[in-house]
């Protein structure tokens, strides 16, 4: 039987159909918002997965190009692997849902979001978060706390829920808020230097709207929800836990209080060896339980240290940033480099400049078709001292790269100001917490070193949180390192300039953040950000005045848009010849702007511009031109005065004296001065050598 529920969000209808699709799924819903439609299916394995120490949740977000009436490009003509945007949307769905599953739940859970129809005014990724939460709540899977999501814009000082395309073009804030009815679960934001107070107000504005969507989900669950399965939760054997903890607690505590990371890890390895020697025979088949007890003991000690003893593992104050060093120009042949070190976290970012034709072409459901500025993030195994095969970028690398990219996007100059494609690559050389925000700092250094005129330098910081079991007691931590991130409750990343915030991403391991925690984290991040920006400015206070000698050079000329066809030529014949002859790259815009780029060949740029100007310049009656004779006849000579533009010098106009034979005065290949005497209705150009000579003589006399 098909059931339907409807509600209104931001003046538009949100509708959910139950029982319409996916009859064999544990839960399947068909959800629409305006003309945007997403199908969500949620399923779980019947038994827990053995031999793992994590919750195997898998979230998929699949865009179908038929949803916007497009056929995929390329030879295959079907959707391939998920796009970067699809991966980012899947991560945005995962983060607010994962903390709300029961602790110790080890069953495989998969949520598949399939985008079926897209109206650009209504974002499918926002609908997918709401639909994923609702599908889980309706299913028999042990997930019982609804999560809602909205997008928030800021136009002319007014907050807008789920802004339309027109509103998104004018907004200075792109914010996604996910929340339960009691607490904020996740925030993603990009903004044009938004101050902390405005950002906090925007988050709270979105939070209030989320409560209405949560109420809608609760109504649906009350009417159509399945009975929940009793979960089988993993828990370490009580006897093992008691004995191991009794034997090792003091040794683990002593190790955890060592401030130096390497020394602490070395001591922990010794403790683990002692535990293994003590219990390997007695609990031969309980290795996983022993590992779980060690982890829980470490976590208990670190959290107590932070929450009750006001002490951090490395001895810093709660609002203190680790020691920072900045360096630029360390690679001789690249266009720009920045090496940023914060404690044991180190990132090297390299900037590369290219022609505008080097933009990334996007083949997705969004209206955006290309990307001129991009940031890629690499996290090799050696950055954490491990050995593993080197593969392509995973979801984490794509997510961290996009986060740092978003932080700097509002600061990148327009293509008119800086006519280059910009690619940044951040190489994580050492990781001990917050490498994504170190990438923001490294990117700023690299851009300044490359001579990119960004509006202002940007920096990023990660804030952490420790809470008591009842969530009543909480402490916000500045610049979390790996151990605080691993055992803590929050990763709150904030990037921006001295003027305001350009990006936020935060998620939690608990059932959401209090309003006061959000405010404290924003304020703490601002103080830390300003401190880091001071260090960056000490290293390189402004963009370099000159580009690297190895960077390409681009010149811009403007022509009449009606003349674009003359530059391109039939089938691209003219422009391809210019490119081949001058070894340049040419990008033509519809408004008549032409960008000419060459790698280390400035003469090629000048030559190409000269040719283009010749092709597009108008012949003016009365003007004198230096032209080349291309053909002679018995009645006159044809002279090319501009590229592709010829005129006729009649035999009577060649000289003051009577001319019997054209070749007596000029030959093919001669360069002569001619004056345009007439352009007839058919565009034919009449020239006079005699008049040109007379005018030049007249100018000499003056």
UniProtKB/Swiss-Prot annotation:
KH domain span: 552-612
Needed co-factor(s): Mg(2+)
Single GO biological process annotation from the record: mRNA catabolic process
Pfam family, one: KH_1
Primary site of residence: cytoplasm
Record key words, sorted: Cytoplasm, Magnesium, Metal-binding, Nucleotidyltransferase, RNA-binding, Transferase
Protein name: Polyribonucleotide nucleotidyltransferase
Gene (UniProt): pnp
């Amino acid at each position: 039987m098909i059931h339907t529920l409807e509600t209104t969000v931001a003046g538009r209808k949100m509708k959910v159909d139950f029982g319409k699709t996916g009859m064999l799924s544990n839960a399947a819903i068909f959800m629409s918002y305006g003309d945007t439609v997403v199908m969500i299916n949620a399923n779980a394995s019947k038994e827990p997965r053995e031999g793992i120490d994590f919750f195997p949740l898998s979230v998929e977000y699949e865009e179908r190009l038929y949803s916007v009436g497009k056929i995929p490009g390329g030879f295959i003509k079907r959707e391939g692997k998920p796009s970067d945007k699809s991966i980012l949307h899947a991560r945005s769905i995962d983060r607010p849902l994962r903390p709300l599953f029961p602790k110790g739940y080890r069953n495989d859970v998969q949520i598949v979001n399939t985008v079926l129809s897209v109206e650009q005014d209504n974002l499918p990724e926002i609908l997918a978060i709401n639909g994923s939460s609702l599908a889980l709540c309706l299913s028999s899977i042990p997930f019982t706390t609804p999560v809602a999501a909205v997008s928030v814009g800021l136009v002319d000082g007014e907050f807008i829920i789920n802004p339309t395309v027109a509103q998104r073009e004018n907004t200075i804030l792109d914010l996604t808020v996910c929340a339960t009815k009691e607490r904020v679960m996740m925030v993603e934001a990009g903004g044009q230097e938004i101050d902390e107070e405005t950002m906090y107000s925007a988050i709270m504005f979105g939070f209030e709207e989320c409560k209405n969507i949560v109420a809608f989900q609760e109504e649906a669950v009350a009417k159509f929800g399945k009975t929940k399965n009793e979960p089988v939760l993993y828990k370490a054997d009580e006897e093992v836990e008691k004995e191991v903890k009794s034997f090792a607690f003091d040794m683990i505590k002593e190790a955890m209080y060592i401030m130096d990371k390497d020394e602490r890890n070395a001591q922990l390895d010794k403790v683990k060896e002692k535990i293994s020697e003590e219990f390997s025979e007695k609990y031969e088949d309980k290795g996983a339980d022993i590992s779980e007890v060690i982890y829980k003991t470490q976590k208990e000690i670190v959290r107590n240290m932070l929450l009750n003893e006001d002490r951090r593992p490395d001895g810093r104050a709660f609002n203190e940033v680790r020691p920072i060093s900045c360096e630029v120009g360390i690679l001789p042949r690249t266009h720009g480099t920045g090496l940023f070190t914060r404690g044991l976290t180190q990132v090297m970012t390299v900037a590369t400049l290219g022609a505008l034709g080097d933009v990334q072409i996007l083949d997705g459901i969004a209206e955006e078709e290309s990307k001129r500025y991009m940031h890629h993030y690499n996290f090799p195994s050696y950055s954490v001292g491990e050995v593993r095969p080197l593969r392509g970028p995973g979801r984490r690398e794509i997510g961290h790269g996009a986060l740092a990219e978003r932080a700097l996007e509002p600061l990148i100059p327009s293509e008119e100001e800086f006519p280059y494609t910009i690619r940044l690559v951040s190489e994580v050389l050492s990781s001990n917490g917050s490498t994504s925000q170190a990438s923001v700092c490294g990117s700023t250094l690299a851009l300044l070193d490359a001579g990119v005129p960004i509006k202002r330098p940007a920096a990023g910081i990660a804030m952490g949180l420790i809470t008591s079991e009842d969530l009543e007691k909480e402490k916000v931590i500045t610049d979390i390192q790996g151990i605080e991130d691993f055992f803590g409750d929050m990763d709150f990343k904030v990037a921006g300039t001295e003027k305001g915030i350009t990006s936020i991403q935060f998620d939690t391991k608990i059932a959401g953040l209090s309003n006061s925690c959000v405010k404290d984290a924003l304020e703490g991040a601002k103080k830390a950000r300003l401190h880091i920006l001071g260090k960056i400015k000490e290293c390189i206070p402004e963009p370099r005045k000159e580009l690297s000698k190895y960077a390409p050079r681009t010149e811009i000329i403007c022509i009449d848009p009606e003349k674009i066809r003359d530059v391109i030529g039939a089938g691209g014949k003219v422009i391809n010849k210019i490119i081949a002859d001058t070894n340049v790259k040419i990008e033509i815009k519809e408004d008549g702007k032409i960008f000419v780029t060459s790698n280390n060949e400035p003469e090629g740029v000048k030559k190409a511009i000269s040719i283009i100007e010749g092709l597009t310049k108008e012949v003016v009656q009365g003007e004198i031109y230096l032209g080349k004779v291309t053909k002679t006849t018995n009645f006159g000579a044809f002279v090319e005065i501009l590229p592709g533009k010829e005129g006729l010098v009649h035999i009577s106009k060649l000289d003051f004296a009577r001319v019997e034979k054209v070749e007596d005065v000029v030959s093919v290949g001669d360069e002569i001065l001619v004056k345009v005497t007439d352009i007839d209705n058919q565009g034919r150009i009449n020239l006079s050598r005699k008049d040109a000579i007379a005018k030049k003589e007249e100018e000499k006399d003056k």
